[in-house]
Amino acid sequence: MKNRKIWVMLVGLFTALTNGFMGTTLTFAEENEASQTIEQPSYISDFPNQVGHWQDLVGTAEKKNDSAGLWIANTKQGTNLESVSINLDAREQSSGDLELTFLYEGQSNFGLVFRGDKQKTSQWQSFAYNRDGRWQLGQPGGKWLTNIPGPTLLSGQQYKLLVRYDGKKIQTFLNDQLFYENEEVHYPDGTSINDDWMGAVGIRLFGNLSKLNIISMKSGPVGSIPVIDSSAEYRELKEKWRNQLVSKEYDSTNQALVDYVQKISNEATELDQTMNKEPNRSYLWPLEPGNTPSADLTTQFTKLQKLALAYGTKGSTLYQDDKLAATIIDGLDFMVTQKGYDGKKYHGNWWDWQIGVPQKFLNILMILEDKVSPEKQQIYTNALSSYVPDPFKQLYTKPQGTFVDLAFIPNFVTSGANRTDLALTVLGLGILQKDSGKINQASSSIVDVFKLVTKGDGFYQDGSFIQHNNIPYTGSYGNVLVKGVGQILAITADSSFQMDATLVTEFVENVDRAFLPLIYKGEMLPTVNGRSISRAPAVGKTGYGSTTMYNLLIVAKFAPNNYQKKFQEAVKYWMKENPDYYLTNARDFNDLQMTMQLLTNPEITGGQLPFTGTKLYASMDRFVQRTPSYMFGLGLYSKRTASFEAGNKENKRGWHTGDGMMYVYNDDEVQFNSSYWPTVDPYRLPGTTVDTISLADEVSAFTTITSKEQWVGGVTSDNQAVVGMALNKDGTKNNGKLLPMNLQAKKSWFVLNGQIIALGAGIKGDTEASIETVVDNRLLNDAYQYQVLSNIGEIHEKNETSKKQWLLLKSDHSNANMGYYFPEETTVNVKSETRKGTYKAINEAFPSDKEYVGDYRTFTIQHGQHPTNEHYAYVVLPGIDETDLKTYAAKKTVEVLSNTEEIQAVKQEEEGYLGVNIWSETGGTIAGITSNKAISLMRKTQQHQKTYTFSDPTQTTKTLTLKIPKDYSTVISQSDGITYDDATETFTINFENAAGSSKQIIVE
C-alpha cells in the first residue's frame, strides 16, 4: 500500500506539471487508485498564478487574476445581467463536492454552478447567496427554492462555501458548518432535482452587476473535500463565556464565595416572587422611577439575567431549577413577542436596543444552554442579529414609546467603546450560531479601536483616550472599551480565532499608558469620567475604581508576562487598601474569582505604588502628578478638547470642570467622593478662574464647548512639570445660546514634589456677577476636626476677607492638611459653608433623591466685575503642617520671575528648578532663555548638568529656535529633530507631528 501511495503522488505531480499548474486534474485510473487510500479533490485551483480555462454558458463574465486570486465580473448583454461560467480544468461529474473560498465585499446574487452541460445553456444547477441571510437552490426552467434561510455574510470576511451534491441530496456548508441539508430536493412545481446530469462546475453571477474575488476553488468526488468538525471549539468558546458569569463549583468554606452566591440567590428569589406571571400581563416587573420606555427594556433583561445567574451558579437555592429556567424563557418570549424586541422595530435610545439588551440576552442564553430549544434560540439570535448586524452600524435615537422601522445611521461607523460593545454581541452571536465569520469579524473590528489615532475617538500615543470626538473619557467609555476588548481577547485566546500576538501587545501597552497614572486608591480621577461624574453612585465607592481593577485583571489574563505581573501587582496594591469592597462588588463570577486568586497569591505582593511622577496627556488636556503622599490632577480644555460634556440630561452643571480645575487628593478620604458632586458649588471649583454669572442647567441633547485657544499643554520630567492654559470663555454657549461671557486669562502651574505653584495673569473680562480665582474648595470629612489658620491667626468667621501670606486648612488626621502660601501678600476670602444637594438635580438619566450634605471651606481671590489685567500667585502644599508652612513662608523659596500675559516663569533654587511658559506667538526672553515662538520649558539643574525639557503646547508649530544661557561647554545629548548651530549658539527644534510631546537638551 505504501508503494501505491507514492506512485499516486508521483502521477499527481506529473499531471500538475503537464497541466502547467492550471489546477490539478487526475485521470480516472489515478483517481480510482487514489480512492483506494483516501478520497482527494480531483481539481484544485491555482488562481494567483493562472486564470485557467473557462467557458461562458450564459452571458459573459470578465476574468483576471492577481496575487489575491481570481476576479470574476458579469457584464450586461442587452438586458441580461446573468453570467454562468464553467471551469474547463475541473472534471465533469454527476455527484461530488464543490468548494469555493472567496472574499465577501457586500455583493448579492452569486454562487456555485454544478452539473453544467457544456453544450446546453439551460442545463446546469446552482446554489447561490441572495442577500441578508437568504440563499437559493435550483436550475433553469423556473425550478428554484429562492428563500433558504442561512448565515448572513459579513463584508470584509473570507468564507469557504462547500456544496455536496449526491443524487437528489444536497448539503451545503459555510466555513465547515452545515446550514442546509435536503435528502431529496423538490421544487415548488412538484418536480425533483435532476440527479442524472453529468456536468462541469463553475460560477454564477446574476440580478445585478458585481465582481467577486475567488481565492480558491476545489472539486472532487463526494467526501473528497473534508469538513472539519469545529463544534468542539464552539463548545469551548461558549464554556469560556459561561464561566465568566457562573460557576459549577462551590466551596462552602470560602466566605467570599458564600456571600457572593447568597447575594445572587437572594436577589433572584425576590425577583422571582415579584415577577408578574399573569397570562395577560403587560409587564414583567413594574416600570422603575426615572426609566424611559427603552431604558425599561434594559432593566427587564437585567432582572432576567439575575434570575439566570442564580440558575447557573452552584450553591444558589435556585441552582439548576427547571421551574426557574422555564420562567426565564417565558420572560424572554414575552419581551420578544409582547414588548417588541423582535428584530423588526424599535423606539427611544439606540443604546438600549443595541447594547443594553443584547449583552444581557446573550448572557442568559449562554447560561441556560440546552434549556433553550434550537428553535427558540434561532428566533432569539435572529432578533439580536437584526439589531446588531455587525459592530459598525448604529441606530438613530428615536422618540420614546413609538415603534418605528429599524433606521441605521447612513455613512456612519461606530468607534471606541460603542464599537467594542457591539463587537462583543457579534462574538456571542457567532458562538451561538456557530458562525466563524461573525467571530472573526468581532475580533477584527476591535483592532481599529486600539490602534493609535491622531484625532477623534481612540487611544493616542501619549495615553490619552477620547470619545465623542473631543471628550477625555478614559474612566467611563475607556473602561467599557477595555472590558469589551478584554473579554473578546480572553474568550478567543488559545483558539483558532485568537488575535495576533503583536496586536494583543499593542492593546496591552495602550492600557498601561492610559490607565495606571490616572488611578487614586483604586478609582479613576473624575477628570476623565466625562458626564459620568454626575451619576448617582452605588452605596460606598463610586464604582469606577472597582470596574477598572476588574478590567485590568481581565487584560492581565492574556497580556505578555511582564505586563501581566505589572497589572496584577498594581491591582493588588489598590485592592489591599479595601479588599472587602472588591470582594463584595464583583460584577460577575469572573470578577470574584480573579479577585480571590489575586488576593491569595503570595507571589504577587502589591507592595509598591504603581505610578509615581508626573504625566501629561497632551492629546486630551489632562495632567497628573503622583507622590507617595498625595495626587494632583488638572482638567483643562482648548480648541482641541471640549471643556465638558452634558447630554441625556446628565452633568447639567459641569460648566467649569475644564476651566483649570485642580484635583488634590490627600488622606482626607472624602475629596471628590459620592457626596462631592451633588453638593459642591459648580461656580467655584478648585483652581479655576471663573465668571460666576448664573447659568441654566444644561438640558440640550448633547453639549460640548471648545475654546478659541490652542495654547494648552506643558512639559514633564520625573516628579516635576510645567503646565499652562490660555483660558478664553468667549464663544461659550449655554443650552445652545451664545453667552456674553468674555473672560480671558493665562494660567500656569509649576509642579515640584510637594509644591504646586499656580500663577494667573492677564485676567480680564466683564460680568454682572464676579470674576474670581478659586484657590481651593475643600470638602471636609465629618469624622475629622478642622481649623483654618493663617499668618494673621485662626479664622472663625463663616465669611472672612483679608490680606494673607499663608493659609492652613488644619486637620487632626495625619496627612489631611492643606497649606497655601502667597508669594506676595494677597487678599483672600475664606468661606465656611454647608451645602446640600441630590444627584437628581444634576442628572435626570441616573437620578437619586438621596440628599447629600457637604461642609466646605472655600478660599477665593476676587478680581471684580471688570478686571483688565489682574493676576494671582499662590502655592499649594499638600499635607504640610503649621510649623513647616511657617518656615516655608519665611524662607521665600519660590521666586516668581515673571507673571504677565506674555511670560510666566518660576524659579525654585533649592530644587534646581526653572519653569517657563512663553505665551506670545513671537516668543520672548526670560532668565537668559530666548524662544522665537510660544513654548513651555523646564530646566532641571543637577550639579554641573542642566536638562532642558520643552514642548510646543499649541501643537501647531513646525519649527522654532531656542537659545539658552551659554554656561555650558558640551551638549551631552539632544532629542531627534534638534539641530545646533555653533556659530549662533542656537538650537532649531522640529516640532512637526509632536502632538504636544516634549523634547530635551542636556548640557554640561
Swiss-Prot record:
Residues at the catalytic site: H468, Y477, R531
Stated family: Belongs to the polysaccharide lyase 8 family.
PANTHER family: HYALURONATE LYASE (PTHR38481:SF1)
InterPro entries (alphabetical): Chondroitin_lyas (IPR008929), Gal_mutarotase_sf_dom (IPR011013), GH-type_carb-bd (IPR014718), Lyase_8 (IPR038970), Lyase_8-like_C (IPR011071), Lyase_8_alpha_N (IPR012970), Lyase_8_C (IPR004103), Lyase_8_central_dom (IPR003159)
Organism: Enterococcus faecalis (strain ATCC 700802 / V583)
GO MF annotation terms: carbohydrate binding; chondroitin AC lyase activity; hyaluronate lyase activity
Record gene name: hylB
Enzymatic reactions: [hyaluronan](n) = n 3-(4-deoxy-beta-D-gluc-4-enuronosyl)-N-acetyl-D-glucosamine + H2O; Eliminative degradation of polysaccharides containing 1,4-beta-D-hexosaminyl and 1,3-beta-D-glucuronosyl linkages to disaccharides containing 4-deoxy-beta-D-gluc-4-enuronosyl groups
GO BP, sorted A to Z: carbohydrate metabolic process; chondroitin sulfate proteoglycan catabolic process
Pfam families listed in its UniProt record: Lyase_8, Lyase_8_C, Lyase_8_N
Top-level taxon of the source organism: Bacteria
GO cellular component: extracellular region
Record keywords: Lyase, Secreted, Signal, Virulence
Main EC class the enzyme belongs to: lyase
Entry's induction text: Expression is up-regulated by 5 kDa hyaluronic acid (HA) in vancomycin-resistant strain V587 cultured in human urine.
Phenotype reported upon loss of the gene: Deletion of the gene in vancomycin-resistant strain V587 leads to significant defect in kidney colonization in the mouse model of catheter-associated urinary tract infection (CAUTI). Double deletion of hylA and hylB genes in the same strain leads to a significant colonization defect in both the kidneys and the spleen in the mouse model of bacteremia.
Name of protein: Hyaluronate lyase HylB
